[in-house]
Amino acid sequence: STFQVSLAQKKSTPAKKPSMVQITTDYGTIKIKLYDETPKHRDNFIKLAKEGFYNGTLFHRVIQGFMIQGGDPNSKNAPAGQPLGMGDVGYTVPAEFNPALIHKKGALCAARTENPTKASSGCQFYIVQGKTYTDAELDQMEMRTGIKYTPAQREIYKKSGGTPFLDMNYTVYGEVTEGLDVVDKIAAVQTNRQAGDRPVQDVKMTVKVIE
């Protein structure tokens, strides 16, 4: 039958690209699954991780109830108190927006500067902590942004929380599968507002690809 033909074809697809990464910090380990629906961001992150690009960089911007941000190459060995966040790799990644991929707690997302196509930084990322929302708040959000959430997405924002105001504005390209407690621990560190919300004690990372 034709059904069996399609099954046979499926089997011969090329080996799946790696899509799991691990971020190790003094606060513990965060495991992240990169989404296949955002292949440009997935492949770029894997490439940088394999090159060791992120090793020794910091979570340089941390805001409790919002997110933890990292991936600035200038944060390696940066003197204490130096504001960070301008370092880059010299290219951007085209936005890969998908209404199914939301800024729930634990979402891995691409940072970016203001630009008309909302292209992502080639290296800087953030992991969402966020807060929980009520139905009324989500209704207002939908009116403001024009986004319509599914009942399942609403449940996520009501129960686990996130940052829905960033949806379809910044590319979401992965999610934490283990170590949400580590995200919470990092989000709670003491920060220096004058240095762009940089943690007072450096939060260094190493990132490796889990093959």
Positions of PLM-derived features:
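Cyclophilin-like peptidyl-prolyl cis-trans isomerases
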Residues: 3-211
